[in-house]
């Protein structure tokens, strides 16, 4: 009988192929001895991580349901202000346990710490087994049936898996280093192991049933856009957004009210206004925040859009919007300059006027894209000058039809520079959106398309912000023209106009 062969992969394409191959699964757990709920072996044999086939799908659904109960922003809130004197692993588990409303988060963290090393294959001894039994008793007292025990096992597994990987991310992302940079340059999970559940072929290599596959994520990740640390479908980490929010909270990085809207586990619909009245009317309708449309600002002044002609008008509009009781983000084209210091100065002016966010685009008026390094320098300069301003880094690869295949690479550079979110107008196909969200660390913003997916479906695909761009402004112009024409031609008027008093009431009343 032949012995299993060990295959080592260190190139990005082959590692990604191995992670995506359903035949390659984590090393199977050892057979369980003893009663259920009382050992590390039972835990490993009951969680999604070490399962395959139907058992994996069923257990993964349990984890997804657990995570669906809370938004990443809630995880960030629970982790913020944590006691920094304890070790990162304890802080990670305590923060996640608190967010999930588990009893005695401090005790849960202590017990998970005793289980973690044994869970990942090291010898934890009887102490680790006793810690598992205590966790089961604490999190599911009195539960003895198989279904209930499987559910609590996957709750514990969620905590254990967060323990090491998220703690490593927290340690590596200190001193203000963006987590996106860490995940691509120094991934916290550097090696993964898989076992072939059946014969398969990966990157031209024949892998027999039982063979071991060692994946060097650290070597494979260098210079590539999509982070490998969260795996790939069908076994991609379901808690990716929660882990990132947890790390940011533990690092003491505040999440502004505007940023929080991007971490609710669904898509934020951001309508775009062009003056105070339109912004105030949208806010009165219940929209949690508004953006501005550069086309509306420019056209209202008789100027071209995208030609860096409305810098002062944009600042003045921000000053007017800042008088209102609503959150708003400003479309600032490319920052109205190719000097990062000047863009940072503009960003500070907008922030001081009341803006919660800024859009910076890499498309130029001549139909070309700005050098990626230049746009990244603008982003970094803004984040250094105004850390509390949400920077939405836009790439126009799809909008201008210039090398859409380079979109993920450009966005990865912008994320490394510190972008809080990224925007890809013109991207509307479902497969492209799903592929891009898998490659990103920060929230994805797309432009609404009447021919594309609706808001709920975009949220399910991983989109976290949907802008309306100039649509409302163009609709308003069309409505004004059609109403005037109908009156002139004796036709019916559509009606539905806001009463004079309602429009008058939108003004903040401070002169």
Residue ranges of each PLM-predicted region?
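Conserved cytochrome P450 K-helix E-x-x-R motif and the immediately C-terminal K′/meander segment
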Residues: 140-146, 176-219
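Cytochrome P450 catalytic-core helices
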Residues: 153-179, 238-254
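Alpha/beta enzyme core
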Residues: 256-328, 336-446, 450-468, 475-477
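Extended, intrinsically disordered, low-complexity segments
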Residues: 258, 470-511
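Active-site substrate-recognition loop segments, prototypically the cytochrome P450 B′-helix/B-C loop
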Residues: 1-86, 93-103, 237
